Amino acid sequence: KALFFDIDGTLLSEVTKTVPESAKKAISIARSLGHLVYINTGRSYGEIGQVRDIAEVDGWLCGCGTYAESEGRTILNRLMPVEQVQRIARLAVDCDADIFLEGPGVCYYCSKSGRMPFGQQLRKNFGNTIEWLEPEAVCGEVNKFCLLTDEQSDRVGLFRNLDLDIAVIDRGEGFYECVPEGFTKATAIDVILEAY
């Protein structure tokens, strides 16, 4: 009775950056037959503003399982402690890596040099982003974060000193998605299934 779809590369074409009408129609039909339809994405809730109207759905599962909303109600919102976020952001900047902190309301981008092209692209793609903060100035809600590194970054120092309760997913080309240990997209699915 519950269907879960990813955004990037599943509903949203990576080529056209649009959702095919056939997918919108299929979602509508599924809902009319009584099925619950959810978007389950690695993006944080603060990053989905530009895609919230792709189709009418029952809820959003975001941030690699750290946030779940169903029928307009937040039923999971795993936040990282502010002190931990500030410490990790400082570590990233000191190791010459860019860090993109993702939360339910807003995203933060901290960078020593701003030289990473992918970081520039992330800032453009995800509308509600506060840029170029000093790590200690980050004071909002954060569910997860991404690290962007290159040959000038101190990756060894960065990962040696990263908190042990953070799961690091290597996405390739110096891009790392980092989530509180124990959270995956399946975590949010389980929360929805338990609620219904």
Residue ranges with predicted function:
Residues 17-18, 39, 79, 148, ...:
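Residue-level marker of alpha-helix boundaries and capping positions
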Residues 1-16, 88:
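Asp-based phosphoryl-transfer active-site loop
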Residues 10-11, 67-68, 173-175:
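A short, flexible beta-alpha/helix-coil linker loop
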Residues 6, 63, 148:
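Conserved residues at the C-terminal ends of beta-strands
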Residues 95-98, 102-196:
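Conserved acidic, metal-coordinating active-site core of Asp-based
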